[in-house]
């Protein structure tokens, strides 16, 4: 198995990227996670009243604030369970554009995040001349789909790590994976750090 440094990315670094982060970490992968949004947005007491936090706000703080605000509501909609999972993985949501790390594979969870990562890589320039495979696995932003999507990402990550020549084999690996996961559309691009 190849030692690949991986990353998972969604908009707020809360649901999809964190479920995939958890699953990959538990499987022994070297993984980090980020969000591409301008802020962390979570459902609020009404559709037009989301809870908005700055990236870097500790998951513990968000958990405690929402629990004090309306524990019954945020338990029923799964937010407190999600935040409890997240705080066991890392301290706080992190923003993609603020990191300085280098990855072999970046998994994004929706097309706009894929585009944001690809744009950011181009803006950074190719200083290290180090390729990175950016793979979008389109996952709807709800608990059930994040669990299904994370398992799909894990299977794809294992196939990528098992390859003898990732650059030469990646298209075949993704084609085979896509046949097995037709409800999780894939996109792929090569960027550079």
Swiss-Prot record:
- Biological process, per Gene Ontology: intracellular phosphate ion homeostasis; mRNA 3'-end processing; positive regulation of telomere maintenance via semi-conservative replication; regulation of pericentric heterochromatin formation; regulation of siRNA-independent facultative heterochromatin formation; sno(s)RNA transcription; termination of RNA polymerase II transcription; termination of RNA polymerase II transcription, exosome-dependent
Q: Which GO terms describe its cellular component?
A: chromatin; mRNA cleavage and polyadenylation specificity factor complex
State its Enzyme Commission number(s): 3.1.3.16
Recorded hits in InterPro entries, A to Z, give: Ptyr_pPase_sf, RNA_pol_II_suA
Query: Where on the tree of life does the source sit, at the highest rank?
Result: Eukaryota
* Main subcellular location of this protein, as a coarse class: nucleus
Cite the entry's keywords alphabetically. Hydrolase, mRNA processing, Nucleus, Protein phosphatase
**Locations listed in the record:** Nucleus
Name the catalysed reactions: O-phospho-L-seryl-[protein] + H2O = L-seryl-[protein] + phosphate; O-phospho-L-threonyl-[protein] + H2O = L-threonyl-[protein] + phosphate
MF annotations from Gene Ontology? protein tyrosine phosphatase activity; RNA polymerase II CTD heptapeptide repeat phosphatase activity; RNA polymerase II CTD heptapeptide repeat S5 phosphatase activity
Sorted alphabetically, which Pfam families does this protein's record hold? Ssu72
Keyword Metal-binding in record: no
- Disulfide connectivity? none
List the PANTHER family hit by this protein, alphabetically: RNA POLYMERASE II SUBUNIT A C-TERMINAL DOMAIN PHOSPHATASE
Q: Can you state the subunit structure given in the record?
A: Component of the cleavage and polyadenylation factor (CPF) complex.
Task: Give the family from UniProt.
Answer: Belongs to the SSU72 phosphatase family.
Q: Tell me the function of this protein.
A: Component of the cleavage and polyadenylation factor (CPF) complex, which plays a key role in polyadenylation-dependent pre-mRNA 3'-end formation and cooperates with cleavage factors including the CFIA complex and NAB4/CFIB. SSU72 is required for 3'-end formation of snoRNAs.
Protein name per the record: RNA polymerase II subunit A C-terminal domain phosphatase SSU72
Q: Which gene encodes it?
A: SSU72
């Amino acid at each position: 198995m190849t030692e690949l440094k991986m990353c998972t990315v969604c908009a707020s670094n809360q649901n999809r990227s964190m479920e995939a982060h958890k699953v990959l970490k538990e499987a022994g992968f070297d993984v980090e996670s980020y969000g591409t949004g301008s802020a962390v947005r979570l459902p609020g007491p009404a559709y037009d009243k989301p809870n908005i936090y700055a990236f870097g706000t500790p998951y513990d703080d968000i958990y405690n604030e929402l629990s004090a605000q309306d524990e019954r509501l945020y338990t029923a909609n799964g937010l407190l369970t999600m935040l409890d999972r997240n705080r066991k993985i890392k301290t706080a949501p992190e923003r993609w554009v603020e990191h300085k790390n280098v990855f072999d594979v970046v998994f994004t969870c929706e097309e706009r995040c894929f585009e944001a990562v690809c744009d950011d890589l181009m803006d950074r320039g190719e200083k290290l001349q180090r390729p990175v495979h950016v793979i979008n696995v389109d996952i709807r932003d709800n608990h059930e789909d994040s669990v299904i999507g994370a398992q799909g990402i894990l299977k794809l990550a294992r196939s990528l790590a098992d390859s003898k020549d990732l650059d030469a084999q990646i298209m075949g690996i993704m084609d085979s994976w896509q046949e097995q996961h037709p409800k999780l559309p894939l996109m792929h691009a090569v960027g550079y750090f």
